[in-house]
């Protein structure tokens, strides 16, 4: 099954016209194609409502100004986390989302593991997916000899020390901390 509305629509349109598809199945394919169109209209309506909310909300405007954050990330953060005052610091917000390393301690020894993955998985996914283009843009700026800002420089230094995905999670963690400060 293809991912994406346009690919699914094209696949169903081809299947309807295909002689190998039984005649009994074609009305069901028409119904599925209509459901895809209806869902796309509903998604557009929800995105329009979110855009209207973001225009009126000063917090959403500030959150959307953070590199890597867009309409969905800003509104999901406001809906999920509520107010910044619920958290003592940016670290607590990032920890609540599940972006901080899991700590294992025994006696005087402490080790850090992978991210804890606690909290809202949708918000965490949006932040990590927002961090990936930020990292890619930093790499492209280096290739074209353009200057880097502080966050991009830090992201590239981090990527040199670890894998791309770990760097994206660490950037998402930093984005959550920046969001708390801007909120």
Where are these regions (language model features)?
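A detector of single, family-specific signature residues
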Residues: 1-183
